[in-house]
Amino acid sequence: MLTVKFTTAYKKSYKLMKKRGKNLSLLEEVIDTLRQGKALEERFRDHELKGNFKGFRECHIQPDWRLIYLIENDILTLTLVDTGSHSDLLNL
């Protein structure tokens, strides 16, 4: 089982998603699955990121709600980097 680390950006974005009325139980389901070291269901469209985010992964909680995360197996840590819409995450 992985230890979960929350970045400051993630904590701030989590509050924003709560304020926007997002179904946070969907996010908790994804986090719990990742924490257990299991693969996400195909509906979450989990994929590796490129460019500046190389090494990080992203999944789609809902069509315009994403989670960026990093799994560090050497220290068994799941780092939740950020969550939000595509525009939120890319600062568009």
Regions found by a protein language model. Give the residues of each.
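Short, functional N-terminal and low-complexity linear motifs
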Residues: 1, 14-17, 34-37
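Enriched for short, Lys/Arg-rich terminal
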Residues: 3, 9, 15, 19-24, ...
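Residues that recognize and position ribonucleotide moieties
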Residues: 3-4, 42
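A short, surface-exposed loop/turn module that caps and links secondary-structure elements
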Residues: 33-60
